Amino acid sequence: LTPAQQQLLLQQAQAQAQLLAAAVQQHSASQQHSAAGATISASAATPMTQIPLSQPIQIAQDLQQLQQLQQQNLNLQQFVLVHPTTNLQPAQFIISQTPQGQQGLLQAQNLLTQLPQQSQANLLQPQPSITLTSQPTTPTRTIAATPIQTLPQSQTTPKRIDTPSLEEPSDLEELEQFAKTFKQRRIKLGFTQGDVGLAMGKLYGNDFSQTTISRFEALNLSFKNMCKLKPLLEKWLNDAENLSSDSTASSPSALNSPGLGAEGLNRRRKKRTSIETNIRVALEKSFMENQKPTSEDITLIAEQLNMEKEVIRVWFCNRRQKEKRINPPSSGGTSSSPIKAIFPSPTSLVATTPSLVTSSTATTLTVNPVLPLTSAAMTNLSLTGTTDSTSNNTATVISTAPPASSAVTSPSLSPSPSASASTSEASSASETSTTQTTSTPLPSPLGASQVMVTASGLQTAAAAALQGAAQLPANASLAAMAAAAGLNPGLMAPSQFAAGGALLSLNPGTLGGALSPALMSNSTLATIQALASSGSLPITSLDATGNLVFANAGGAPNIVTAPLFLNPQNLSLLTSNPVSLVSAAAASTGNSAPTASLHASSTSTESIQNSLFTVASASGAASTTTAASKAQ
């Protein structure tokens, strides 16, 4: 309030207090002080706007006068000023304590209620008035005057506070009922809350969000906003129902009417499909039989159940998703686990080879993915953990490679009277292995040379060889074994092998990590020895091209019998040219039986995917089984 308005309020309060004091004095004089005094106090309460009165000087003086009258007249009635907007008759508030004082009270009341009209002309509605009430209380009696916030006519009317009036409960009930009805009819028509907001935006130029419609239906908006939205939603609902009823018999152009807009009806929500219990049971049975039916199967099921094909298709899709949530597939794949195949056979692979260890029991062949197996027949190849020279009739490649990441099991071949068949299973991440050793006497000494490749990484595994290969039948083909191991059998044709020929395919990662760093390192060359019947064959020359040439120390006429071709890039050799290991070996019995050959070849400029070690059977014809691997 401005200072002028405050001054006006003070003047009005002073006038009211003076009128009250005059009325009390007149009443006291008419009664000739026959009644006892009463406490008359006028207190100006704070207005509604919480602005205190700054100059209550005159009121304080009037209060002092009233207190003096109180001491003189103790038995006067108590007068209370109540809110002027209360529509109550003054007679309801007057309780007379003495019959003599009732008439005087009514006269005083009339004097106080009839304020000068000129003072009220400057006030806005509601106009202030003073109503006298009497209450029998303690001798301490007060008269409380409550001024009302008033403004001159030149000032604007204060904004109405949104508080429910006496008539609003019925409006709230009506709004609640309308919101409930609106939601039901909207769902029946197939519109979403977002559709309603867009359609109302086209109708009234104001887009309403889906949240606003949702809050209206849930009665979460203010009363004022609910009242604003109700007529708009009511009009939209009537237009939607009229258009929906007319569109069934009218042309498609009705969809483009301005009542809803094309988006309104086009975005109708499809009704939820309800499937009966017996049909659901039949679908579950079909799902257990086949989780992914073809289009023909879905059509057949739809015809049997008298349902739409699309409904059946969607049900199967949803059911598969539910199955995934209930039974999630295991995260671990088979690529990291060993491949195991059992090959039971009571016969030996090569009956004429005396160095094979035969067994009639079924043997588990463990193949690690990083060391794929393409043929099960390993007759004369042994991977052991020794770094010393072996005995006669064995061509040895000795290396000091780092620990190998995998191990392959096969019968360990040695010219001793007893053959040690060791089974070693090692995972790709650990060298820990369980070794089972059995001893079987050999019927006759070895008649041809064998090739032994030694890696230090296999020392902890004792011996590594393909034991299960010995139990395969003699007519087992390379293609069958490769298919059993999950590999491509086209690496080498079985016709390239003689009876008992074998193929072991090593992954480049295995060779590079186990054999190549120590076979041909820059610091030291691996000790490579070719052994014949009369003793070991030392390295005689290393030419400029990197070819290693071995001489026959035993005087045998055979010079080149067991060549070895290795890729310099794949096996980290000294130069880019292939390195040939040429050795000579004679038969232990003096005859010129062919010795085993070990070949691995590829292009000298590109790394190979798989190095192929091939070993020819000692009892077969002299064959040079060379395999060229596919270049990357």
Swiss-Prot record:
Keywords: Activator, DNA-binding, Homeobox, Nucleus, Phosphoprotein, Transcription, Transcription regulation. Phosphorylated by PRKDC. Pfam families: Homeodomain, Pou, POU2F1_C. Residues 243-258, 394-441 have a biased composition (Low complexity). The keyword Phosphoprotein applies. InterPro entries: HD (IPR001356), Homeobox_CS (IPR017970), Homeodomain-like_sf (IPR009057), Lambda_DNA-bd_dom_sf (IPR010982), POU (IPR013847), POU2F1_C (IPR045703), POU_dom (IPR000327), POU_domain_TF (IPR050255). Residues 243-273, 385-448 are annotated as: Disordered. One of its GO terms (cellular component) is nucleus. Widely expressed. One of its GO terms (biological process) is olfactory placode formation. Interacts with POU2AF1; the interaction increases POU2F1 transactivation activity. Interacts with NR3C1, AR, PGR and HCFC1. Belongs to the POU transcription factor family. Class-2 subfamily. This is POU domain, class 2, transcription factor 1. The gene is Pou2f1.
